[in-house]
Structures are given as C-alpha cells and as structure tokens.
Amino acid sequence: MSKPQLDLFGGQPVHASRGPSGAMMSLDERHRYLLWRKLDDEGHGVCTFVMLNPSTADATNDDPTIRSCMRLTRLWGYSTLTVVNLFSWRTSDALDLRAADEDPTGDPKNLLIVIDAVQQSKMAVMAWGSSIRRLGPLRARAAEVEAALREHAPDKLYCLNRNRTGEPTHPLFWRKDRAPIRFLELSL
C-alpha cells in the first residue's frame, strides 16, 4: 500500500501514515516532523512533547524515549501523545546534527507543525534536554522555537524540570512520581 503524500513543504515530498499511531516523515525517512500515538479512549486529550530531534521511532516502531513519553502521557491521564522536535533530522546521536549533509531543521514549515501540535494539545512538555548546549550555532533553534511557542500557546507550556544550565529536562529517565511544572514560571 502506498503512503499518502502531502504537499505541506512547498513541493518537498512528505508522507504521513493514518490511524491511531503514525508519523509524518520525508519520503527518504531522514526527517520526521510529527509522531503520534493514540494510547486509549479513557484519557482526556492530547499531550505533546517538544524534544531535540527524532531518533529511530517511526509510524509503527517506538524507541526508548517514545516509550517513556507514552508512559508519562498515560500516567497524566491523556489519551493521545504527539511528539515534535526542534530539529527534524533523525539520528540517535544529537551531535550528528552538526554534521548533517542538509539543514537538520528540515523544511522551514517544521516550525508551523511544532506550533500547531502545541496549540492542538492540552499540555505541551518542553523536553529537549542538555544536548542542545553542544550544538554550537544550532543552539539558536531552541530560542527560536521557544519564542514562537511563548507567543502562540504560552498557557500550554510545561516541562519536567530545568537542568543546571536552564534547558528543559529530557523525559527518558524521569521518575514517574514527579508531575510536570509550568515552563514559563521557572526562572533560569
């Protein structure tokens, strides 16, 4: 079965799966723009995680980070998880973003997908972690996305915590007995 193609990116081919679990990815699958998982019918709405970059998870396969996000989303009582990223380039090592042979942010419309996902959710968890500090000039992407989200959906922004250098904590090893906190109320 062929995958539906969407023209969201000015002619750049993108495919998106349909159904309770899926992803929007470039045709070559080097970029992932959006991932979603319907977890159950009992929860109340969508929880979105905004992280650094996608790893190996795709429309049907989960990686450890996605499994952690699914666990937290269920724990907090949401029915659906969506995941967006500062960078769309898929890699298991964030440092590879510096050496990508193309722009690791993907198409400029990636920011619109991030904003839309956050606006469509009841809660958005900022969670890109400390790896952003090692990305040199790419670090500016976090400030760009954060500013856009502060403008378009400030009341929906949460995080697990902030690390010593101010970045929102990554969810992979987060204890499940800790609740998310308002992102904008934390001082750096």
Residue ranges and their predicted role:
Residues 55-77:
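A short mixed-secondary-structure module that forms the rim of ligand-binding clefts
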Residues 79-97:
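Short connector loops at secondary-structure junctions
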Residues 97-188:
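Glycine/proline-rich loop-helix segments at beta-alpha junctions forming the active-site rim
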